[in-house]
């Protein structure tokens, strides 16, 4: 089914409002100055609006008395902007409609999508698999032979936990913008670069050096030009190192703002999920739709009531197995014997 919305000409973006003062003959502005249209007598005006000539915008109108408005330069620019916005809206609407029609119209074509693993140490059995094809049929849960079912309870795993402790130490190290590394060559006394040229710190006093990581703490008051201490215990860096500290602070601030925005978005997502009316039932419905559980068929009445009605019915077993698996709280029970060897209950009435 081919749908081409872009081929339909939409004249709304070509519509301009006519100047009311011009209609009364009292407009003091010219056609090039007034923000409303001044159409000639040959143009058709309906409800105080006039349609601009599309060919005139392209510079190819050859009509002598065109019934559409040939707008001036400033109105032509406005119409071009309206046309671009209208084209974007048409493309967006066409894409959304095509996506909706893909799911509404059944077809035999199966589109292959990227597969994803579902065996996180739990569902490694061959009986639990997911097809990588999208079909018009809804997903459902089916019963499989008991010999290929896993012995452990089957649960639906959620999102794997994400560990953030690995990069915590490195992030803390990067967030310390008030420290500079001390030049090791300067400590040995053979640094050929001067204090204003070396990219590492050249502290005058050794007590201010932190021996654990060979760094020195920068005086932030000196960076802001307001340190009034006579003997400051913090390092007063030169101009090029001050610029380095300020750049590191700016980057740290941007990182903090981005992290705060991400945390706010995550909190809003969690609050939206908690505000759902039926979060648990919706999850169960998505995992196991109602199409997988067929209604329990009515058992035909028996002529004899000599205890034969208490025999086992295979259809009841299948329904109970599906219900037990849908609860996801306890392992499903499967009998060891085969249900095919049992005599159907309907054949007992003829004996």
From Swiss-Prot:
Highest taxon, organism lineage: Eukaryota
GO cellular component terms attached to this protein's record: cytoplasm; nucleoplasm
GO biological process: mRNA processing; regulation of RNA splicing; RNA splicing
Chief location: nucleus
Keywords from the named record: Cytoplasm, Metal-binding, mRNA processing, mRNA splicing, Nucleus, Repeat, RNA-binding, Zinc, Zinc-finger
Function field: Involved in pre-mRNA alternative splicing regulation. RNA-binding protein that binds to 5'ACACCC-3' core sequence.
Similarity-based family: Belongs to the muscleblind family.
Name the UniProt record assigns to this protein: Muscleblind-like protein 2a
Species in which this protein is naturally found: Takifugu rubripes (Japanese pufferfish)
Lineage, broadest ranks: Eukaryota, Metazoa, Chordata, Craniata, Vertebrata
